[in-house]
């Protein structure tokens, strides 16, 4: 007579319940918890590392750094969809990124992490010593509450965390996240990036007895846990942060040599020209220059000549995403790809680069410029494996021609490109009609083709105006509208525009965020980053191929495939990029001999140099 499983357990002297518990214990013992997570298991630093290579372990603590910020703020809660938020809270996450690796995170609030090979779940062990600024311990309950609270508070988090099925406490200092899908390599990293919020604070009451609500704006400084805490807030004007002397994570390897300034201040300006004048007047210390004109002509003031201000180009190993004129394809006028293509033919980048930008820029031709993920030449065999099943839904040129932008380097080419644009508009049903003495593009219903460029900085008008002239030569009516930042944010969050300056930033390891940039669900969700309104099942499938890539080669192939599909659909009019940061600073700071590969590292790994500061003051 064969023995049943229950009989075997009895012979072993164990009850079924005890045996199951023993199996669970054995499984737990088989789990190899690690100190770090990486997208493809290529972790640089070992478990016993002492510090990151790009820091100065002997960096002095002290001094201050001041930043200028364009805009204003009426809210200090960074987790809600509402209001204009100021930087006043610093909440640690379970993990923190290394600045010299593409996609690796090391333990911060979490001391160790484990996931199975199929990435169906991830388990974190929390550090018992982790604390909020009020001294209360960071617990598993805080982690679990944070995930749901963030989902409720902001559409981005709700989308970003949508494949997290549940979070639950699995030990005294342990949290388990279970996922609704297997094979999504980025999901463990996404959970590691989540800021851990203090449940007791957000569910409590303020000093006036009012119930706090993470879904709403507030000017009360939220409780944090990081290395800095807000010390002074002047609504709409400035925020002063001070380093927490007894910060719980000071001695962790990920903290050594970082956060060296005693004070960080953010000073707000409503006008970019006023902000630059404030920098010249030593009202703040550090500036990343976004204006080619100012970079070429503006840094000739006395402090530069006296070497009090240093300008420097800092090259980075980073992906240059797509900055563009983003066309809102939710609107009928942009539904036909030929209209969108015509607008690219009308944009004279070469004239703008020579006459406005001092020749500093390279024309963007990819959503992954300056990286191995940029599509070049014709599709490879690996790319075709993704593309062929979708061939009937794709532009045929994608398979036969490398994507390039029209070039307007001569008067002849400008005329040629305008003729091509006119032919494309004709083919799309927008033909020229004389009306009130003007040549206008109209459709079959007699509606004129009109475009509004929505801007929030006057500096963009100098770029839009020459483009307007080219478009008007085609019979298109153009209105350039510059609004204040608050109105701009309201309109862009609800996609109330024809054309805006769009930016699709990319990391070295694209993943789940591509759904928010290009996914169909995001196209209909207010506040998403899908500014164009792309709702294409082909794009959705390729985005999934990115997310579920099994190795780096597969990820690169899927990104190149997405690049081809996006560019050949002409969703945007590409602008330009530069492969370095243009920086200017008052010369009061020291830095490591080698900066991290993927970040300028300011102010994280820089420090106050008292000797330099004294020299600047003496000049």
Regions found by a protein language model. Name each.
Residues 29-118, 148, 152, 223:
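N-terminal lobe/hinge region of extracytoplasmic solute-binding protein
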